[in-house]
Structure formats: C-alpha cells, structure tokens
From Swiss-Prot:
The keyword Electron transport is annotated on this UniProt entry: no
GO CC field: plasma membrane
Keywords, sorted A to Z: Cell membrane, Membrane, Transmembrane, Transmembrane helix
Pfam families found in the cross-reference section: TM7S3_TM198
Bilayer topology: Multi-pass membrane protein
Locations listed in the record: Cell membrane
Bilayer-crossing regions: 10-32, 37-59, 63-80, 83-100, 104-121, 126-148, 163-185
Protein name (record): Uncharacterized protein AF_1434
C-alpha cells in the first residue's frame, strides 16, 4: 500500500468517525483511569512535532529524528505526570477561551495558563471533568459529521467549526451535556469502587 493510499484510508469518513467515537468513549468514561496512557500519547505527538521541527531546520535523517523524539516525548509524559496535567489543562483552557471569547485571543492564552496551573493542584476533579468534556465533544462531533457529511478536512481548515458542530442545535447540546454528566459520574463511581477494593 502506497503512503498516499494509506493517508486516504486513515482520513476516510468511516475511519475518522470510528476513531472519534472510540477515543471519545474511552476518554469520557475511563479518562482518569488511563491518564498515564493518555499522557504518553500527548507526549508522543509533542515529541513528533519537535522531531519534525528539528528535521526541517537542522537535520537530514527525518525518520530517525522524528521517531526518537516521539519516543522520548512519550516516555517523558508517561513518567512525569505533571507534564500531562499541564498540557491537558492548558489545551482545555485555551479552547474554553476560544469558544467563550473568539474575538479576544489573549484571553484564551490567559485561561490556558490558569487551567494548566489549576490542574496541577486539583488534579483528579479537573482531569475527570476535562477528559469527560473532550470525550463527549469527540462523540458529538462524530455524530454531527455522520449526519451532515462534514469531512475532517473541513474541520481542520477552520477548528472553530468544531464548536459550531458540537453545539449546532438543542439535540446536540443535550447529547453533549448528557455524555459529560454520565462520564463524570462513571469516572467517580469507578474511582470510588477501586479505592474501596484497595482498602
């Protein structure tokens, strides 16, 4: 299979919708429980971006540099919980700022810094909330894309369309809110049961 064929397969509507739903369900209902894995995936992507930057600007052997930096990023984020907490909080705060005040970009950065800091101190409640919101958003986006036929390239061209899609009408609002609430309750109940079993 050629790289172009593989890229077309991975970005096909069925693959994208399936990925969004599966990742959304995992994050929504067991996001806190698998936080190390989730954090390692974030590190992998950040390491990959660093590797691409190094390759473009300084180095010739692209595959080795990108692979090495992705592995280092994944290991760092898996071993140092604070890195995942900071990045998760910052990303959440940034998108909240973009959604609430799209005209004032500076507030998105302020909220990103604020949520990154807060997530370090109230790790469990905020991480449960954030993973539930991200998971519910992924599922609601997948449902909207499936119904309307919107393709992932349309979303990538203008990320603000994500919010328009998720909150496009009362039904999507209800779906999103129900998933967030169910995700939070499920994660807390699971965590509580595990703590009781340990005692």
């Amino acid at each position: 299979m050629q790289p172009i064929e593989l890229a077309e397969l991975l970005t096909s509507q069925a693959a994208v919708l399936t990925s969004l739903v599966v990742i959304g369900l995992i994050l929504c209902f067991i996001g806190y429980k698998i936080f190390r894995v989730y954090s390692a995936v974030i590190g992998l992507f950040i390491g990959q971006l660093v590797g691409i930057y190094i390759t473009i600007n300084y180095y010739e052997n692209a595959l080795i540099v990108i692979l090495a930096s992705a592995i280092v990023g994944a290991l760092l984020f898996a071993l140092i919980d604070e890195l995942g907490l900071i990045v998760t909080g910052a990303a959440f705060g940034y998108f909240v700022g973009v959604y609430l005040l799209p005209e004032y970009q500076v507030y998105a950065f302020v909220l990103a810094a604020l949520f990154a800091l807060i997530n370090l101190f109230i790790e469990k409640p905020l991480t449960v909330l954030i993973t539930s919101v991200i998971g519910a958003s992924a599922i609601a986006l997948a449902v909207h894309m499936g119904i309307t036929g919107t393709h992932i390239y349309d979303i990538l061209n203008d990320p603000k369309k994500v919010f328009d899609a998720i909150f496009s009408n009362a039904y999507f609002d209800l779906l999103w809110f129900t998933l967030v609430l169910t995700g939070i309750i499920t994660q807390y109940v699971t965590y509580k049961e595990e703590r009781e079993e340990e005692e």
